Amino acid sequence: PTVLEQNWNRLDNQHIFFTHRYNVGFSRKVKMTEEEIKAKKFAMASKKENAEENAKEEARKKAKEQGKKFDEKAYDKQQGAKFSGRPDGAKIAGDEPAKDSDAKDIRNDSTRIAVNGKAAADSLLAIQKKNAEDSLFYKSEYVPVTSFIHTVKFDNYRRIYEAYQTPADYYLKEYYDAGRLTGDSIYDQTKHWHMKNTFAIAMLEGFNKWAKAGLKAFASYDLRHYELPTMEGGFEKYNEHALSVGGQLSKQEGKTLHYNAVAEIGLTGVDAGTLAIDGNVDVNIPFLGDTLQVRGDAFFHRETPSFYYRNYHARHLWWENDLDKTIHTRIMGTLSFPKTRTKLRVAVDEIKNYTYFSQSYDITEEGLRTGVIVTPMQESGGINLLTAQLEQNFRLGILNWENQFTYQHSSKESVLPVPAFNAYTNLYIKFKVVKVLNVDLGADMRYFTSYEAPDYSPYMGQYTVQGNGENNVKIGNYPIVNVYANVHIKHTRFFVMMSHINAGQGDKNYFFAPHYPMNERVFRIGVSWNFFN
C-alpha cells in the first residue's frame, strides 16, 4: 500500500526556440502540373467572360446616359461579328522580306524559310501555335542550392518536491534539516536551464540531376546550468559546456529508395569523446497493387550519463558519482504492407554501462515502509534486449479490429525488466448517420504478462528498479478492458466511456506500478470542440 498521503511534485518549465535560414539558389521555368494547367485555363476563361460582361455593362450605361434604349441582341450580334473574322491564335504574315542580293526571285531567296506544300505550312503553323500555348503554362520555380541555418534553443526547468507528515524512519538517511520546511515536512528544490546553439550549412537534395542526396554539416555548443541544495539551506551551482560537430546525408525524394544518416561527435567539455551515429533506409517495392516497404534503422550511441545520475542533492538523497560512458547499439527492421494493414518490427539492442535507479526499503509487520533509499547504479556488463512486434488491423464493412502484439526478452531482468508479452486490441464499429454524423462504438483491452515492474519513487519523480531481492513484487497478468462510444459531427466530438469495466474480476491484480493500484470502474462523459474559423 502507498504510505505517503501528502506529497507533491511540481514541475515548472519554459521554452524558447528560434531558427532562421538563408537560401542561395536560382530560378528556373518548369511546366505546370495538369491540375495547375486546368486551373489556369479556367481562370483565363473566367477573366475573358468577366471582361465581356464588363464591356456589355459599360455599353448599357453609355446608352442610358445618351437616352437610348440598349439593344442587347444587336450588341451580342455586333460583338460576334467583330471577333468572327479571325480565329484565336491566327497570325499575320507581315511585310514581305527583302530578297537576297544574289537571288533572282523569291523562290531562290536564302533568307526565307522554305515551306513546300500546304501540309508543311499547316504543320509549321500548328507547331508555332502549340509553342505559344505551352509558354503560357510554365511557372517560375526557385531552387535553393545551399542553406545557412542558425538555431537557438533555451529550456528552463524547476522541480519542487513538497511533503507533509512524512512517517518516522521512512527514509534511511537525512543529510540536513534546514530550508523552507523542517521536521516531518520536506521542501526540496532543483533548478536547471539549458541553452543550445547550432550552426549548419546544407547542400539541398535535387537541385540538379547529379545532386541525388542532401548534405549538411553542423556545429553545436551547449551550455547547461544546474542548482542543487546545500546542507546550509542555500544552492550550489554547476555549469557544463559541450562542443560537438556533425554531418548528415539524406535522400527523401523519389518513390523507391530513401535514406538518412546523421553522425555527431563531442569535442570538448563534459561530452568530449561522445559519439552518436543514427541511420535509416527504406525501400518501397510495388507488390500486389500496393507498396511493400522494407525499412531498416540502426544507431550507435556513446554518451555521458545525464547530470542527475552523476550529481544529486536532497534532504534524504545525496550522491556525487563518476560514471563511465554508456554505449547503446540498436539494429531494427520493419516490414509494412498497407494493403493487408500489416506491420512487423524486429529490433535487437545491446547496452553497456547501462545507468539506472534502484530503490530499496524494509517492510514492517504492519506492511509499512522504512529505510527508503534510491541509488544510481551502472551495470558494467552488456545487456541484450530483443523486441518483436506485430501490428495487424482488419476491416470488414463497418467492423474494425486493431491489434498490436509485442514480445520482449531482456538478458538481465534484474537491471532492465520487461514483460515477456504485452497486447493491445481494439474492436469497434464505425458508421455514419445521415452522412454527417460519425459514430464509433467499441471496446479495447490492454494486457501484459507478470514481471517485476519498475517501482516509482515520488521523492525523485522517477521510475526505479526494485532493489528488495526476494521481497520484489510482480504485477501483470491482468487485462484492463474499456468500452466507449464516440460521436463526431463537424468540429465537435461527444464521447462516453466506462473504463476498467472488468474491475473486481479475477485476482484483482490491477497495477501498472508496484503498490500503485489503478482506479476501479469509472464512467466518463465529455465533449471536445474545436474553435476555429
Enumerate the predicted regions with their spans.
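Periplasmic-side early beta-strands and strand-to-turn transitions of outer-membrane beta-barrels
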Residues: 1-2
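Exposed, low-structure sequence patches enriched in small/polar residues
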Residues: 6-50, 54, 69, 101, ...
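Long intrinsically disordered, low-complexity regions that are acidic and Ser/Thr-rich
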Residues: 47-123
